[in-house]
Amino acid sequence: DGSISATDTHPNPIEVTVLCKESELESVMAAVCKVLSLPSVDARANNSCGLHVHLDMRNRKVDEAYKKLFHSQSIMLNMLPSNRRSDTSPWAQQYCQRNKAGTFSEHDKTSNRYFNINTKSFTKFKTLEIRSHSGTVNATKIINWVKLLTMIVSAEVLPDTTFRSINTFSEFF
């Protein structure tokens, strides 16, 4: 990935891609992060690294999933360090902007991939990519982030519910 910056102590940037079933997330991520933490590997994430999560949309309605993620952005972004939020970071303004279009189709026709919720991955992979989390080799952080995102897109919403932005978990569930 051209956006990853090497350091003097870790001169070889690597990108790790993990594909697994949601039901296997915990065991797979624990194993991957265990290997990355071995002294012989000594993988580390610096500020140029990001955790990008692709959420499978093959069995979900992408329009509804996008709306749920869109209206949950405040919660998602407030959980992250300030350097990952586009309102406080020039880097995030360039590579991870907050989505402003409220519908999937509206966002997809006008945007590039450098948004908190990347809709461009849907055409190629049938996923929505969430780009905002900072890079990490901590399995617990990765697992909890993916579980949160999965809960958001899988939440039951009544047909007559009006989507609105939310700021706390209690408002969402």
Regions found by a protein language model. Give the residues of each.
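C-terminal accessory/tail domains of diverse enzymes
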Residues: 1-45, 58-173
